[in-house]
């Protein structure tokens, strides 16, 4: 079975435009309920959201769909994605739902689904749900399984949900340690963690400088958060803070800044935690699981210490799947999704930050020393925006394939090229890394030019937009 609605991180799109409409949310809820209902017990689903305006549309539509199928709904309001996974498990619920488009702008939204074990659904399960949606009104469609008048579900609010999540995150921090004496900037992206993140740090003893904690439905991720950490970095310098944290809209990813304002990505965080846990005998699987986007320097760093770096396709769900299958407990993405399976079933930016802070407190060293774990190779990532409705397939174009082969030949065995389509946005991502920064930039520029030549612009007369995401270091 193929998936058309679901991407690498659930269903995502522009709010009130197919597929991110109230009607589709209703269908998704009904189809998911039909897929998961088993036996005669009262089925329960947990629903959370971030702070987008469209959450007020999608949350009740999902609620109506589940209730119509006889499932009780527990509403927890704005909370991070990892909180949904945690609450789904702790409440013994059958499902968890997060209404969020993560790091995307406010006009997008999405639906992420979690099973009773707190893990995101498999590709096969998502395909089965899609098949039920496609069968709407026919045998096998969700409408065929509607609950009777006496069997409808109920919806209620769990008022102490934020407190439950706060205590769960704090429990991951070593007993006997506190954050006394540390000044920490935390950028909550005007998103799902705007209440809980500052509280966690404050309750552990830190002096907290909160940023982007005034959501208005429109400002989520706007010039703030993990994908725009400039304000956080500036605040670290302004307030002479010891560390800066930037979360994204649903708080499942983390970017840091040390006391000098230098940005620290997920690769350095994974290297730090992997090394620390290996030294303590806590690291499982003999290494770390990351994606094809992680810097080659991380792989070399781990190899020098007798540890392995296992690479998966892009998407934290694939990282988690490999961790579960092969027994790893540290994994993540360069973009800041950090998965620590001893504590959580999905990426949790706040939880990962506490592991870094524990290392800073244990060693008594500044963040600039603790977090510069390895020397990354020069790496450049650029995005080319295209119109998927135009039917063009840039990755299959002969000119693009020729540019990739030429780039690989120029880098030889001293670097690599990766080009892929984003699973969440209409972007072609072009990445190269190697020892020579100038050569890397030249290779990326040539491939980007080839992709642009093969790309249909989004609007008549508009050039394909290219955004440099991570400059070479």
From Swiss-Prot:
Pfam families linked: PGM_PMM_I (PF02878), PGM_PMM_II (PF02879), PGM_PMM_III (PF02880), PGM_PMM_IV (PF00408)
Protein family membership: Belongs to the phosphohexose mutase family.
Known cofactor(s): Mg(2+)
InterPro entries the UniProt entry points to: A-D-PHexomutase_a/b/a-I, A-D-PHexomutase_a/b/a-I/II/III, A-D-PHexomutase_a/b/a-II, A-D-PHexomutase_a/b/a-III, A-D-PHexomutase_C, A-D-PHexomutase_C_sf, A-D-PHexomutase_CS, Alpha-D-phosphohexomutase_SF
Disulfide cross-links: none
Identification of the protein by name: Phosphoglucosamine mutase
Annotated keywords: Isomerase, Magnesium, Metal-binding, Phosphoprotein
Originating species: Rhodospirillum centenum (strain ATCC 51521 / SW)
Alphabetical list of PANTHER family matching this protein: PHOSPHOGLUCOMUTASE (ALPHA-D-GLUCOSE-1,6-BISPHOSPHATE-DEPENDENT), PHOSPHOHEXOSE MUTASE
Function, as annotated: Catalyzes the conversion of glucosamine-6-phosphate to glucosamine-1-phosphate.
Highest taxon listed in the record's lineage: Bacteria
Enzyme class: isomerase
Gene: glmM
The record's free-text note on cofactor binding: Binds 1 Mg(2+) ion per subunit.
PROSITE patterns named in the record: PGM_PMM
Any GO CC annotation of this UniProt entry: cytosol
Positions carrying Phosphoserine: 102
UniProt GO BP: carbohydrate metabolic process; peptidoglycan biosynthetic process; UDP-N-acetylglucosamine biosynthetic process
UniProt catalytic activity: alpha-D-glucosamine 1-phosphate = D-glucosamine 6-phosphate
EC nos: 5.4.2.10
